[in-house]
Amino acid sequence: MKRTLTVLTVAATMFASSASAFDPDDLQILRNTGDCRNCDLKGADLRNTSLNSADLEGANLRGADLEGANLRGADLGAANLEGADLAFTQMNGAILCNTTMPDGSVIYSGC
């Protein structure tokens, strides 16, 4: 019984870790090009990153740390920012059309 519980605990931990992690290839694409449409960046550390005018349409940024990031003029249409940290993030002129915000609300700005 004790072994079964240990196996189940390890399996659940592995599943939870993989379910909340970003795709490293997508993060590399973003870092190399500044664009990443429909990318999986959930939980990514993007603090103080310059993403000025980046194309992040449809990106999954759920739980991402965007504190202090520059998202001026970025296209975040249909992106998911639920649970993301946007403290001190610059978003002037960003497209937020059908975008899920950190609190779960959906806004339609710049459509």
Task: Please report, for each region that a protein language model flagged, where it lies by residue.
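Bacterial N-terminal signal peptides
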Residues: 8-14
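Tandem repeat scaffolds
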Residues: 20-111
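Positively charged n-region of N-terminal signal peptides that target proteins for export
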Residues: 1-5
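N-terminal signal peptide c-region/cleavage motif recognized by signal peptidases
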Residues: 16-18
